[in-house]
Amino acid sequence: MSDDQTSLSKSAVPKKSRDWSTKIFLSFLGVITVFYAVILTYHVAKPPETVADDSGLLEQCRQICLQYGLVTTGNIRKDAQAYLDVVQKQHLTDGLSVILADSSFKPSESQSIALLNQTAPDFSLADHTGATQQLSVLGKNRPVIVVFYLGYGCSHCVAQLLALDKDLHYFRELDADIVAISSDTPEHTSERYKEYGEFHFPVLADVDYAVSQKWGVYLPETEEKPEFMNHGTFIIDRSGQVVWGSIGKEPFLDNKTLL
């Protein structure tokens, strides 16, 4: 065999090896491409905002609950009840006439909020079914308690709604109603209802925080501070005036004051 033939036969083996290496490398790149395509498709089809929001709320709830020695379990309804058991001081069990006649009780005073003694800003928002609810209709010739909460991913927020739902019959005896508002979408609230059960008053979606900002509970981002959402509880009288209000980092749980 000539030297040229020998050289050619030796070079044929590395060429095949390179071909296989190229095929394996290209196959690997193909797998990676498909993997990232699947991830991209998932995030386009199902945006992560709701999950991210819930994660942030759960962390915020965890920090607040730790102040009371409570450890979150991930079960929002269970954690909400645990928060109520520790934080809520007034548990209403007597009849309404007895509660209202209690002269020893000192109700919490209203904060000096901007809306105090002003006409309540009207709103039209969707409930968990997608139906539109309007404050001027809900509160026509009747008192309304308007509650702003951070969403159903927040156990201490849900605690306030649980407490109000438990005492709802007292408010109904006074011909008053309750409406709760958060940035949760109607679909998200509906999913939570299926998991944990419904409340017996309207729970509305203020997805863009427009209503929350008008009521002074949502503070948009500025150059100095990030955006922030407070809890807010307001009493609207029969004439549509805001006669009492509370805004803060934790929910207002003294239902006796609201009566």
Where are these regions (language model features)?
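Structural microenvironment flanking redox-active thiols in thiol-disulfide oxidoreductases
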Residues: 159-213
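Hydrophobic beta-strand positions
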Residues: 124-125, 235
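Thiol-/selenol-based redox modules, centered on thioredoxin-like
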Residues: 227-259
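Short active-site neighborhood of thiol/selenol oxidoreductases, capturing the structured segment around
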Residues: 133-164, 177
